[in-house]
Structure formats: structure tokens, C-alpha cells
Amino acid sequence: MKIAILLSGGVDSSVALYTMIQKGYKNIKCYYLKIWLEDELSYIGECPWKEDITYVDSVCKKFNVPYKIINLQEEYYNRVVTYAIEELKMGNTPSPDIFCNQRIKFGAFFEKINEKYDLIVTGHYAKIENKNNSYTLKQAKDKIKDQSYFLSHLSKKQISKLHFPLGDLLKSEIRQIAHEIDLPNKNRKDSQGICFLGKIKYNEFIKYHLGELKGNIIEQETGKILGTHNGYWFFTIGQRKGIKLSHGPWFVTEKDIQNNIIYISNSTNYLKQGKEQFLVHKTNWINKPLKNNNLSAKIRHGEKKIKCKIETLKDEIIRVNLEEKDYGISPGQFCIFYKEDECLGGAKILKTLI
């Protein structure tokens, strides 16, 4: 069996490689995907992939496994960056990680290697089960690190080629393995950036592509101007972090993109504005549910799932009814559907209702 393993330079993908070697697989080649555009790097002033490559090289030497760097800069820009920029301009909150997985890691990369491999292995926290050639995507054992949310827009064809060996391990167990086998990157911190952005903060990415534009911050209930901000594209509905005003905490409740205004409420009023019904569209079903009840939804990456029912309307729009209110439902983000621990697929949030 020919196996391709995606290495990021981090601990997770390195332990995934070790796990496959321990299982006896020998025909293995590793790949590092380079996506950074040089003008972005010159603006931000740091080259995040050089350190990655150092670790990839040392890990592959340790296990005597070949590796190759694949350049996907053009594909990354055309398939992910342009999507994120357009969503931000429309006042939406994009989810670049979802499309990095669908369009880059398991899209453009699959195209580059021309399906020469029997299996593609990564360090994602998720599980893939195959029963009678019927594939399901499931949550990882580590519910805090679980990445099924970001994998929800993969196709069955993509999933059929994937293997996630870390799905049955906790992060603490992976760190322990890394120390036991003395991985060169055993003490490397996890990446906190979006997608492949590594060390680069999301706001720096947005600032580079959209710049800054002063606008007013207005209290929702009184219409009073409380301060200024640097552009509506830096904010999302429900956001608390970054609103540097006294008498808080404050939360973003609305965005006026025509006039570049951010509306906010304090915690008391904000808690009255939760939503339990909203519309989604552009649905990707990995496995479409047979019944529309007894489902759960994730509105954002994290542990929390909310029980829900769904109803298909005209034009393939779905109405989602949550069993409890959520306070940060934002158009452009994604709602991911689950049946117990199985990730069924996901859809783009169109608008909130009640």
C-alpha cells in the first residue's frame, strides 16, 4: 500500500507518521504544502514556513522517510484567500479552515499527486469509519481538539482516501508519545493561526488584504456613539474580544456595512438577543440524515453541540431550529450537523430568524 503523509512540522502530524510506521507500513512519502504568497510574507515580516521545513526535515531524517515540498501558492490564493476576502467585504464571517481542507489539503493536493497513493494520512483529530464501503466521519476521542467541524465539507470520495490515526488519542497522549520517542519537535507549541497561516494572526491577514477604515461604534439600545473601530471586516456577530471600551463587557450585535458602523450591547442586553432559528444554504452532506430530528448542530469550532431539528424549504434552503438560544450566529459562518458523534455535513449560515 502506497501512503502519502502530510507533515506540517508540528507534533500531531509527526506522531501520525510514527503511528503508521509502527503499524508496519513501509511505502511512505511525506509532503509539506507551501501556500504562502511572497508579498504577504514581506508585508507581515516573518517567514513561518522556514521553521516548519526544519522540523519536517529532522522528523523525516529520524524515520528515514523521504519528503517533498509542494507549492500550492496560486491554488491557495484563488481557492481560499479570494473566498475569504469576498465574504469579509459582504460583512460575513468566513471559515477559511473549512475551505483549506476541502480545496487545498484534500483538493489541490489530491490533484497534484494524481491519486498515485492508496491512502492519505494527516494529523487531524477525527475518525473515519468504513463499513461495507460506506464511509462516515466521526468526532475524535479528544472532544476539545476534535476537528470534524473543519472537515465537514469533504466529499465521500475525499474521505474514502483519508486516514486519521490520531482520532483515538488524546492530545496529552500524543505529547507523551512525542517525548517517549524523542521527536525533534516534541516541545513545539501548537499553531494558533487559521488554516495554514501558522503564526500569523487572522487580523493581520485581514489588514493586509482589506486595510483599515475608521468607523463608529454605536450602542444598540441608545444610538450613542461610544468609540471608533478600524473596519467592520474585523468584527463578527457575538464578538467580545477587541472592543476596548469601559463599562463592559460589550458584544457585537449588528454590522452596517454600507456605513461602516458596528453596533454593540452590554452583557445584560446582549443576553436578551439570542437566536434559536436561522436559515442555511449551500449544504454539503457527507451522509444525509434519514430523519430531520434528533440531530445536533455546531455553530462554531469547539466542544459545544446544540440539539436541533431541520426543515428543508424551497431552493435547497434549510431552516434550523435549535433547542436553546445561541448568541453568536453570524451569516457566512458554518453550521455543522451531527448524529451523536457522526459528522453528517454542514451548511453556510444565510440569516437569523428568531
From Swiss-Prot:
Catalytically driven reaction(s): S-sulfanyl-L-cysteinyl-[protein] + uridine(34) in tRNA + AH2 + ATP = 2-thiouridine(34) in tRNA + L-cysteinyl-[protein] + A + AMP + diphosphate + H(+)
Active site: C100 (nucleophile), C195 (cysteine persulfide intermediate)
EC number: 2.8.1.13
Keywords: ATP-binding, Cytoplasm, Disulfide bond, Nucleotide-binding, RNA-binding, Transferase, tRNA processing, tRNA-binding
Site (Interaction with tRNA): H124, Q333
CDD domains: MnmA_TRMU-like
GO cellular component: cytoplasm
A GO MF label: ATP binding
Protein's cellular compartments: Cytoplasm
Residues annotated to bind ATP: L6, L7, S8, G9, G10, V11, D12, S13, L33, G123
Region ranges (Interaction with tRNA): 145-147
SUPFAM superfamilies: Adenine nucleotide alpha hydrolases-like (SSF52402)
Listed GO biological process terms: tRNA modification
Cysteine disulfide links: C100-C195
Keyword RNA-binding: yes
Record PANTHER family: PTHR43052, TRNA-5-TAURINOMETHYLURIDINE 2-SULFURTRANSFERASE
Family: Belongs to the MnmA/TRMU family.
Function: Catalyzes the 2-thiolation of uridine at the wobble position (U34) of tRNA, leading to the formation of s(2)U34.
Name of the featured protein: tRNA-specific 2-thiouridylase MnmA
Organism: Borrelia recurrentis (strain A1)
Originating gene: mnmA
